Amino acid sequence: MYRTDFASRALAVAVLVGLLAPGVARAQAIIPGETGTTFNLTASTGYITSADGGSLYTWGYGTGAEMQYPGPTLIVNEGDTVTVNLTNTLPVPTSIVFPGLEGVTATGGAAGSLTQESTGPGDVVTYTFTASNPGTYTYRSGTRPDLQVDMGLAGALIVRPAGYDAISNRTAYGHPDSRYDHEYMFMLSEMDHRIHEAAELAVTPADFAAIDTSNFRPTYWFVNGRTAPDTLFPSSYPLFPYQPYGSFVRGKPGDRILMRIIGMGNDMHPLHAHGENSTVIAQDGRLLASGPGAGADLAYSDFTISIVPGGTMDSIFQWTGEGMGWDIYGTGAGYEHGTCTSDQFNADDVVNNDTGMVTADGNGNGYADGDGFHDVTWEYCADHGKPFPVTLPGLLDLAFGGFYSGSPFLGHDDALPPGEGGLNFNGGYHFMWHSHNEKELANFDVFPGGMMTMFVLEPPGTPIP
């Protein structure tokens, strides 16, 4: 059954209050999921919630008796022989396909149009493959995907490269071009509530066969199975027992943030990251390389990444503040933050921050030239000490958002009227990351919502797990 009370404003407040509550975990820059080589998934029915108070009858995969949306993220290592056992408690046959993975074998069940299908609880299908190539993948129903993917039968699969280490060797593809400091998943999907209502009311095989998806018209859009502003809650937050994955992003200047983007639904979606372009390094589980060992030499920079259904893309987002034209840490009394010098004795900029290697002495003066950024804080040295280019209006002439610290300078806060602000813990910069298809920023026509989350740029030194 679908219901809504259009309580988006109240729920948005609840989200933000929840983020402030003592004991609530902050967003973590590591992707949660299931690890191992054998995964026992059950396809079952349940309900998920939307941020406007709606409840949607849903089908999903889970590791126990209860489904989740999206399905559990499966995390394996390059070279692993992986086994996925599918048990089906749905009222219709179902299956799993693994786009981009080679040599998948299926045993048990009954023959379907794309792969073996499970027809009921006692009919387990086993899928086996070797995780030969590292990267980001998806898995989804291979049985009438026009219906079953919209109903929720999809999830993510990550293949870690050989030699991966979560502390000392974070790469997505085993090549330095794919190194990162933090990683986040963006599983983009949509639902048409009319299809879900029809599936909930269906009883006989003929009823399910009669569900018409040709007039597919989504009314909800999701990031990792949640609609905004629910996307801002941490993963495993108790309000969302069947939607465990959050998508709130955190990083510091210079951090390389790996965006694992998946087209989990049946529509194409353009994901737009405010704040800086990102560099697309891989597509469909393959590094954008001209040949073996070339690295991501075919990578490209873009401000909006369009992801197709069933496809995946990996992109590196890195915010440095280069070329802002003013000192983002402030100038004058109260904003002292040392020096930012290059190409001289005792300079702050000696190494290439991305590689950690001392830079060359190109002009022959005996000092490393540097890369233009402070070796510790990533401050862009050319802007050090440059004043803020405008005079800020007085408080009476401003309207405030909850994430405004009262100061334009990173890591600082300033006076605000009573009741304003309060959601910016560290004086960070907040940017919206969202679909660039504006109609997807709504929950059942209630704006704002839908396919939207936030990125907060934290000041240097802020711990990010």
PLM-predicted stretches and their roles:
Residues 2-6, 26-465:
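Copper-binding active sites and cupredoxin-like electron-transfer domains
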Residues 10-22:
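Bacterial N-terminal signal peptides
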